[in-house]
Amino acid sequence: MITNTAKHYNDDFEAQQLRLSSVNRGKWVYQLVKSFLDAGMTWDEICEGIREAGRYKGYHDFPRTSDIREFAEKFATEDLVKVNDGRVASLTDDEFVWEVNYCPMVEGWLKSTDDPEFLEKLCDICMDIDRGAMDTYGWELELKGTIAKGDGKCTICMRKGDGCACGGK
């Protein structure tokens, strides 16, 4: 069973507007992926396209640095914290663990489907944006739990490594 309830920033107008925007983004991501699958694309083909978009994001939206702490500061913005009820769970010189306690995209997906397998795959494929960004640093990304899988929160571990995405498919 999916638990996905925002506990903080519920009275913050800006946070609510950003969340609504992300719910809508979740709806159109669902429709795009569903359309791609219906047109004959595979999950792997969709994954690679999303990952390439993440590589672009990595090169253009984040600082070019070898310092994971500097990256974490630019990643975990105040807006992202508010939208996702997020927090930095751990930060060392080699590892950044980001925790998401509410996902507006999952809320959007649940308006279209309650298929647990599809939701889990959709979540994983959306994380290819971040995997692609990690590729640009030669770092790894591992999902240690996701809201879409029923874990109650997403735990996203980004760490310095050999560049393979330890989250895998």
Where are these regions (language model features)?
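N-terminal accessory segment detector
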Residues: 1-124, 140-154, 159-169
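A conserved amphipathic terminal alpha-helix motif
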Residues: 121-134
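Conserved ATPase active-site switch/coordination loops adjacent to the nucleotide-binding site
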Residues: 137
